[in-house]
From Swiss-Prot:
EC number(s) given by UniProt: 6.3.5.-
GO molecular function, one term: glutaminyl-tRNA synthase (glutamine-hydrolyzing) activity
Catalysis: reaction(s): L-glutamyl-tRNA(Gln) + L-glutamine + ATP + H2O = L-glutaminyl-tRNA(Gln) + L-glutamate + ADP + phosphate + H(+); L-aspartyl-tRNA(Asn) + L-glutamine + ATP + H2O = L-asparaginyl-tRNA(Asn) + L-glutamate + ADP + phosphate + 2 H(+)
Function: Allows the formation of correctly charged Asn-tRNA(Asn) or Gln-tRNA(Gln) through the transamidation of misacylated Asp-tRNA(Asn) or Glu-tRNA(Gln) in organisms which lack either or both of asparaginyl-tRNA or glutaminyl-tRNA synthetases. The reaction takes place in the presence of glutamine and ATP through an activated phospho-Asp-tRNA(Asn) or phospho-Glu-tRNA(Gln).
Subunit structure: Heterotrimer of A, B and C subunits.
Annotated organism of origin: Erythrobacter litoralis (strain HTCC2594)
Keyword Protein biosynthesis among record annotations: yes
Biological process per Gene Ontology, one example term: glutaminyl-tRNAGln biosynthesis via transamidation
Protein name according to UniProt: Aspartyl/glutamyl-tRNA(Asn/Gln) amidotransferase subunit C
One Pfam family this sequence matches: GatC
UniProt KW keywords: ATP-binding, Ligase, Nucleotide-binding, Protein biosynthesis
Membership in a protein family: Belongs to the GatC family.
InterPro entries per the UniProt record, alphabetical: Asp/Glu-ADT_sf_sub_c, GatC
SUPFAM superfamilies (UniProt xref): Glu-tRNAGln amidotransferase C subunit
Amino acid sequence: MSVDKETVAKIASLARIKMTDAELEKMAPELSNILDWVEQLGEVDTSDVEPMTAVIPNTLRLREDEVNADPLTGGGVRDKVLANAPAAEHGFFGVPKVIE
């Protein structure tokens, strides 16, 4: 897949990354090579491969969930923490919108 300078500029703009023309020129072939490699991965026959989430099996010991389980604070400090935030809504931190 071929990526041109304008495509790199658009991606950089969406990611809020400032790039010079020289950086855009350098990045276009690099992104093209990465996407070509991803296309090659898509061509690999994986029909006989068992799906997995990790190479090494993950066996984690589980515990019961406990409300207010924080040993340092005893829990129940959400309101105190949110009181220091510039914006909060429905028990969550409020942040400015960054997606256009």
